[in-house]
A protein has these predicted regions:
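Acidic helix N-cap motif at the loop->helix transition within catalytic regions
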Residues: 17-20, 48-56, 102
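Conserved donor NDP-sugar-binding/catalytic core segment of glycosyltransferases
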Residues: 102-134
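Glycine-rich, basic loop-to-helix element that forms the pyrophosphate-binding segment
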Residues: 69-85, 106
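A conserved acidic beta->alpha catalytic loop
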Residues: 25, 43-52, 94-97
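Short, acidic, metal-binding catalytic loop of nucleotide-sugar glycosyltransferases
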Residues: 24-35
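Short beta-strand/loop segment that forms part of the nucleotide-sugar
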Residues: 35-45, 67-70
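Short aromatic/hydrophobic "clamp" motif used to bind/position activated sugar donors
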Residues: 90
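Cell-envelope/extracellular polymer assembly enzymes that use nucleotide-activated donors
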Residues: 4-7, 38
Length: 147
């Protein structure tokens, strides 16, 4: 069997505070078989510096590609990314998350062992600033009835 390839899709909009960390964590994935075909960042018409950050990072790795999402919504971004993806598999990630280096391998191993068509990891939110809203989101996403 030929080597599988993965297209990573990251929808984003106004994520200038987080996008570099997300992309950097993806670039640091343990990928011994070099299966990451491309990293598609689908931007929903950001009005901050998100697109500039992505464009700058794209100069360091030709797998990083910036796509436009004129509809702004995440569902539309995913549809755009899926249509443009060239990998055998799609990995959907969030723009304001940082992933552990073994995330790709763990997902790949779990999919192979289980035969599942869709796998993912546990979300462990970290509050970077002490805002009430951030604390509320953290409480909801870590409570057993919140997710």
């Amino acid at each position: 069997m030929d080597k599988i390839t993965v297209s990573i899709l990251i929808p984003c909009r106004n994520e200038e505070k987080f996008i570099q960390g997300a992309i950097t964590s993806v670039l640091e994935f343990e990928d011994p078989d070099q299966i990451i075909q491309e990293i598609l960042l689908i931007d929903g018409m950001s009005t901050d510096n998100t697109k500039n950050i992505i464009s700058e990072l794209a100069t360091t790795d030709n797998r990083i590609k910036l796509l436009e999402n004129p509809h702004k919504h995440q569902a539309a971004a995913l549809n755009i990314g899926i249509r443009q993806a060239t990998g055998d598999y799609i990995m959907r990630l969030d723009a304001h998350a940082v992933y552990p280096a073994d995330y790709l391998i763990l997902c790949q191993t779990t999919a192979k062992k289980s035969g599942a068509d869709n796998v993912g990891g546990i979300v462990i939110p970290k509050i970077s600033q002490s805002y009430y809203c951030a604390s509320l989101v953290h409480a909801l996403t870590t409570h057993k009835f919140g997710v």
